[in-house]
């Protein structure tokens, strides 16, 4: 089973991607994780990528395409790709690669939330720069305001978590995804899931669909 999953900032797609990965034994491929790993290396590329994120702008297509497709060369089937493709150029690069290698996508799933919900979820997030613990001012506040429960360090807000940056990222997401959604609708594999509510509530909207696809693909392979 091969899945594309996408959604606006704060939609919970990465959280659900990891649950899906574990439940169905898939390989998790995240463009965001690969970009952040490059930034953490402190490489010249990482420094350039950090500038784009700080301004709420998309990473250049050629960079993201190279990162994702190089990963796909190692894991050609049973994968979930989180947050890619996000532009028409990325769709073209991915589709060309899949066609050349006889790979098909079973479902392109969008977890959708409103702009207001997106801004609230992301802008309230606080990170511990020392141990990496994540908090939220509303949903998971620290015991002592501004301090990490685990190590006592001062919590910070990432630059790209500021409300004005989140709003910009949301608008950019909606604009860029419109033609991509149309493309996957034409292929008959696009599904939109309501991302409002708790993690468990959203998961119960996702699980029946993926169970069905998983069982369908299992039977298809048995009959080959």
Swiss-Prot record:
Catalytic reactions on record: AMP + ATP = 2 ADP
InterPro entries membership: Adenyl_kin_sub, Adenylat/UMP-CMP_kin, Adenylat_kinase_CS, Adenylate_kinase_lid-dom, P-loop_NTPase
GO MF, any single term: zinc ion binding
Primary enzyme class: transferase
This protein's record includes keyword Ligase: no
NMP, as annotated region: 30-59
Residues involved in ATP binding: 10-15, 125, 134-135, 197
GO cellular component: cytoplasm
Functional note: Catalyzes the reversible transfer of the terminal phosphate group between ATP and AMP. Plays an important role in cellular energy homeostasis and in adenine nucleotide metabolism.
Family: Belongs to the adenylate kinase family.
Domain note: Consists of three domains, a large central CORE domain and two small peripheral domains, NMPbind and LID, which undergo movements during catalysis. The LID domain closes over the site of phosphoryl transfer upon ATP binding. Assembling and dissambling the active center during each catalytic cycle provides an effective means to prevent ATP hydrolysis. Some bacteria have evolved a zinc-coordinating structure that stabilizes the LID domain.
Quaternary state and interactors: Monomer.
Record protein name field: Adenylate kinase
Organism, as annotated: Thermococcus onnurineus (strain NA1)
